[in-house]
Amino acid sequence: MDLTRQEEAILNGEQGAGRQKAMELVTALGKIYGADSLIDITSAHLSGASYKTIGDGGLKYLEDLVAGGAQVSVPSTLNPVGMDRTRWKEMHIHPEFAEKQLRIIDLYGQMGIKKTCSCTPYVGPNVPSMGDHVAWAESSALSFVNSYIGARTNREGGPGALAAAILGKTANYGLHLDDNRKPTVVIDPEIDGSVFSYSLLGQAVGMAIGSGIPYFKNISPEVEEAKALSAAMAASGSMALWHAEGITPEAGNFDISDLEVIHIGKKELENAYDKLNRTEDVQLIAIGCPHLTEKEMHQIAEFLKDKEKKNKDIEVWFCTSAEIRERCAEDVKIMERFGPVLADTCMVVAPIEGTFQRTATNSAKAGNYLPTLCSQKAMCRDITALMELVL
């Protein structure tokens, strides 16, 4: 890799141990993936924030970075953590877990990272522009900004995104390059246009192709639908970029005439649904993976406003960002008749396996991760169908 004189100085430790560690990691990744240089980034979004996922080893790594004077160089936001910072007792969290989780959040804050604790920073404080090079680590969020906004990021891991945030640079390879953003397959779907249908579509596409860059025809996703589609494809497959004809900003740049066309219809959507549903009996309904938007909060509250919770045996959690929870105070009052509106967290990175064994969700992403990361039997349905379980 060709490094500038300043980058060489960082690698040699002339700007402190924290920046040196970051440069060692970014250049190592660049060499692995064949990058010829580093590029400046405008923002970062960091995963690896839950004590459940990073453990004591991750906590020690963050402590070492802070001790080495590490500070982020670009606006940086943080992914959900393992609990609501103030309402963790309502989530059945052990005090020792809570103590270490709060320590992790504090360490990120000491490095200058905004303690947003949300997987949807693009509807809040971290909104890239088309063509911006960024380093984002949350799979659903990076797919959204790559695709719907036209920013450029690879599928960063947590340590890599943090290192890039500290440097304000990342290695120039993969989806930062024009040639690697071309679609590889055309998807011709038949869906009803609901948010849940986009989640099932993403699941079906992941099951059909696994990886690649799909180009969608005949869909018109708004933010909520694009969020669901991005999350599902990143979890059921490994897709970090998609295009939609007439919708996403780069879709008009490509000739798709020679690409394979895959039809996703009723049969494929039913197969996706069956894959995500492994129980008819649940103990927890967890809604908000990725985090609920302001529009979704309004819709849920509108549906629930004249209803009451009758099934007291099933807990209900709604997950969103602290900013949106505060902004939707009237909606929260209605929703909290059914269960807590939690911020900072989600069911996937919380230690729910200590309390629950069967969890329902509206998200194909969560439907994939609940069995593997949380030892749950999962149910996946749209929000209305889920809430009818307790009405």
Feature roles, as predicted:
Residues 1-391:
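Non-transmembrane, aqueous-exposed alpha-helical and coiled segments at domain scale
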